[in-house]
């Protein structure tokens, strides 16, 4: 492992089993019903707001993911600061979800708030650059090792633009992603592998083009499958997280990412690393922590402290393949950016966040807490003899209801247990803890405390005791 930031021990994983106990599924169902009643009883204002919202908002929320939380309705928030969220019923929560990484460095970090507030008074958007944009480009180049950068509004946009540039550079149309991935609402990446066929992701709206025309899908950690897929030399780009996170954490096997680099270079394929979630590995993301050499990097979510902003960077070689000239000299519609992209407010927030929030000091606080969170969960799993596991990537921790960590998306998807998942999340929610609703993921922020981690450890043990056979 290349340790760009020596204080980080990026990955933590232990498998300690003495014996297995069975979870009593009937007890889980009864406990879930009880927790559901308690939730509805203690959140009357959120319930009332949800009923009102359903009359004007599709699904009763401004974005459909917000109904993924446990309970009959989402909690409505009045404020969020640091590692705390307070709802309209006056209940306070320790937040380990942190906006599903958008607030990975805390809600409303002071430096970001000050910079954004000051910039709003000076002007929000002009479709002209500010000095902040220069600083941000230089800082991203320093951190991630790629020399040229552009700004986007979301990581979805950054991924979409990166794929467009890869197609321009290679003259190829297809892209390759990994089963179980998520790279935003990019049509080519909202796919899954079903009996060897590329299909639309379950639950997604139909894409405009058959995904088998645009996309190849292989399993993570399977170099032979990747080699077969790339060998026709018809793939413009491999888009991937260096460790999968959106179906739970899946770590790369030893030598796997080196193999990906070798195969993409050999076949003339652009290697794009999506660091949006794996930025948890260190100030320069997984790329710098492990000394990776991608052709492009995309990132978003926490880069502006939670304000809509993202970025993508490219190598000198890719820049010189007419891409740089195309961007520098072409005006009008080239398929990259939008009217509000690179606005002054976003760049001011990005600069403040990069300079004063996403710092080495922050990781020195976050990573040890993640290690403790991971150890507490694994300790409980061991003590109760459950066939579960916990895994850590930097400041991110995940636990699953399966004995061994999955090696790919198919194994991760097969390990899902919706009943247990909903029970654990609702049990936590009723006791003042927010986990990421899509899976059992927790993030530590610079504001997270040891007391917060201890609270989760105790509640986690209590939740297990109530459902043992």
Segments from the language model and where they lie:
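N-terminal regions of proteins, emphasizing targeting and processing segments when present
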Residues: 5, 14-15
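Conserved N-terminal phosphate-binding loop of PLP-dependent enzymes in the Aspartate aminotransferase
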Residues: 15, 19-469
């Amino acid at each position: 492992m290349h340790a760009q930031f020596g204080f980080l021990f990026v990955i933590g994983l232990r498998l300690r089993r003495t014996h297995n106990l069975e979870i009593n599924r009937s007890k889980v169902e009864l406990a879930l019903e009880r927790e559901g009643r308690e939730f509805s009883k203690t959140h009357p204002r959120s319930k009332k707001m949800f009923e009102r919202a359903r009359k004007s908002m599709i699904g009763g929320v401004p974005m459909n993911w917000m109904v993924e939380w446990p309970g009959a309705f989402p909690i409505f928030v009045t404020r969020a600061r640091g590692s705390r969220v307070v709802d309209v019923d006056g209940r306070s929560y320790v937040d380990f979800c942190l906006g599903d990484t958008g607030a990975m460095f805390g809600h409303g970090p002071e430096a970001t708030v000050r910079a954004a507030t000051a910039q709003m008074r000076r002007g929000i958007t002009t479709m002209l650059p500010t000095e902040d944009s220069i600083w941000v480009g230089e800082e991203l180049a320093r951190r991630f090792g790629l020399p040229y950068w552009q700004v986007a509004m979301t990581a979805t946009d950054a991924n979409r633009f990166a794929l467009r540039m890869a197609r321009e550079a290679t003259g190829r149309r297809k892209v390759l992603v990994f089963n179980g991935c998520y790279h935003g609402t990019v049509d080519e990446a909202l796919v899954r592998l079903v009996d060897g066929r590329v299909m639309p992701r379950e639950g997604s709206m139909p894409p405009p083009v058959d995904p088998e025309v645009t996309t190849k899908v292989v399993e993570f950690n399977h170099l032979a499958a990747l080699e077969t897929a790339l060998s026709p030399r018809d793939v413009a780009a491999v888009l991937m997280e260096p460790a999968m996170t959106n179906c739970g954490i899946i770590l790369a096997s030893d030598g796997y990412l080196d193999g990906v680099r070798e195969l993409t270079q050999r076949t003339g394929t652009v290697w794009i690393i999506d660091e949006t979630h794996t930025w948890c590995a260190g100030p320069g993301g997984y790329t710098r922590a492990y000394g990776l050499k991608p052709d492009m990097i995309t990132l978003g979510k926490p880069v502006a402290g939670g304000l809509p902003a993202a970025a993508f960077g490219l190598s000198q070689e890719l820049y010189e393949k007419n891409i740089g000239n195309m961007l520098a000299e072409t005006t009008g519609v080239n398929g990259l950016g939008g009217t509000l992209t690179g606005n002054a407010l976003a760049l001011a927030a990005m600069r403040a966040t990069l300079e004063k929030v996403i710092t080495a000091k922050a990781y020195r606080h976050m990573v040890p807490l993640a290690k403790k969170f991971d150890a507490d969960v694994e300790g409980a799993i061991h003590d109760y003899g459950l066939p579960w596991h916990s895994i850590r990537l930097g400041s991110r921790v995940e636990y699953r209801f399966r004995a061994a960590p999955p090696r790919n998306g198919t194994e991760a998807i097969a390990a899902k247990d919706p009943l247990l998942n909903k029970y654990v999340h609702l049990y936590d929610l009723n006791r003042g803890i927010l986990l990421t609703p899509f899976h059992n993921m927790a993030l530590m922020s610079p504001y997270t405390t040891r007391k917060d981690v201890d609270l989760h450890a105790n509640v986690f043990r209590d939740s297990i005791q109530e459902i043992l056979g």
